[in-house]
């Protein structure tokens, strides 16, 4: 199963923080790719920096200024997260059987076309709340919690779980209980960029080699 998250309706002047959170959740909760519309290089650079420091979990970080075309040319199942949709528990088992899934996460009011193009309009409850929470819950239900235990590829930092306090080590400095650094996750997934449609409309981004001190990710 391959999962991409498409964030549409992003407003660069007001949505940078929450859209970054959508991207971080996509990365940490099992998505293979994150696509932003419209393009906002500052958000994408933040995600690349996290991947550089904490290891690669995303196969693709990209943006498109033609989101409707991106959805129309997606060669797989389209899921739109909306409070007006069907309860997640009523459709998640069926969605889990699909090979390629595009999850649409809206910002401002989502145009009607996306509701019509989606194979599944899925609600994480029918009350107003955060799209970040909706994406996290959807992906966790989709993977049944297994997404939390993937190991990233490469990276510079690892957290060693502790009962109290904080323990962060550089890759290569883990002790016997810290796990092998740079272990490639056994995800059973395709190569980089698989599942991306409308390549002429999507601009991919290589990750820059930045090196910051440990701090908040947003």
Curated annotation (Swiss-Prot):
Say which domain of life the source belongs to: Archaea
Report the protein name in the record: tRNA (cytidine(56)-2'-O)-methyltransferase
Can you state the subunit structure given in the record?
Homodimer.
> What organism, scientifically named, is this protein from?
Ignicoccus hospitalis (strain KIN4/I / DSM 18386 / JCM 14125)
Spell out the Basic and acidic residues composition-biased ranges.
200-218
Q: Which family does it belong to?
A: Belongs to the aTrm56 family.
Q: Which Pfam families match?
A: Trm56
Molecular-function GO terms, alphabetical: tRNA (cytidine(56)-2'-O)-methyltransferase activity
Q: Where is this region: Disordered?
A: 170-218
**InterPro entries in alphabetical order:** Alpha/beta_knot_MTases, tRNA_m1G_MTases_N, tRNA_mtfrase_aTrm56
- Give residues annotated as binding S-adenosyl-L-methionine: 81, 106-110, 124-131
Q: Where in the cell is it found?
A: Cytoplasm
């Amino acid at each position: 199963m391959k999962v991409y998250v498409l964030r549409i309706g992003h407003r660069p002047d007001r949505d940078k923080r929450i859209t970054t959170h959508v991207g971080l959740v996509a990365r940490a909760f099992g998505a293979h790719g994150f696509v932003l519309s419209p393009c906002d290089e500052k958000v994408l650079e933040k995600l690349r920096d996290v991947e550089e420091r904490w290891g690669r979990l995303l196969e693709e970080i990209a943006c498109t200024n033609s989101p409707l075309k991106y959805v129309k040319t997606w060669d797989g199942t389209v899921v739109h997260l909306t409070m007006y949709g069907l309860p997640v528990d009523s459709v998640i088992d069926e969605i889990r059987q699909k090979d390629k899934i595009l999850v649409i996460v809206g910002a401002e009011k989502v145009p009607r076309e996306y509701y019509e193009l989606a194979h599944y309009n899925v609600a994480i409850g029918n009350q107003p709340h955060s799209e970040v929470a909706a994406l996290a819950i959807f992906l966790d239900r989709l993977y049944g919690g297994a997404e939390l235990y993937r190991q990233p590829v490469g990276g510079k930092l690892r957290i060693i779980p502790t009962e109290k306090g904080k323990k962060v080590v550089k890759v290569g400095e883990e002790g016997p209980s810290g796990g092998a650094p740079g272990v490639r996750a056994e995800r059973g997934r395709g190569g980089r960029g698989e599942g991306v449609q409308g390549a002429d409309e999507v601009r991919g981004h290589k990750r820059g080699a930045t090196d910051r001190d440990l701090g908040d990710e947003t």
